[in-house]
């Protein structure tokens, strides 16, 4: 089972479709791509928005998956 982590959006560029999340547990910032955002609306995140997510190892390092705004 995948562990859910909470964090705050450090920054997200809606034009480029990616950004970074700072986990609340103090671990290293995690890359997030718009395709990982679970939403029926336009997939974007706002700076300092609280989110819940899981982490998977991507081709360039850790990447957030199943991102849900709280």
UniProtKB/Swiss-Prot annotation:
Compartment annotation: Cytoplasm
Main localization, broad class: cytoplasm
Pfam families, per the entry: CSD (PF00313)
Domain CSD: 7-67
GO cellular component terms given for this protein: cytosol
Keywords: Activator, Cytoplasm, DNA-binding, Stress response, Transcription, Transcription regulation
Gene3D superfamilies recorded: Nucleic acid-binding proteins
Single Gene Ontology BP annotation: regulation of gene expression
Keyword Mitochondrion: no
Listed InterPro entries: Cold_shock_CspA, Cold_shock_domain, CSD, CSD_CS, CSP_DNA-bd, NA-bd_OB-fold
Domain of life: Bacteria
GO function terms (MF aspect): DNA binding; nucleic acid binding
Annotated protein name in UniProt: Cold shock-like protein CspJ
Gene name as annotated: cspJ
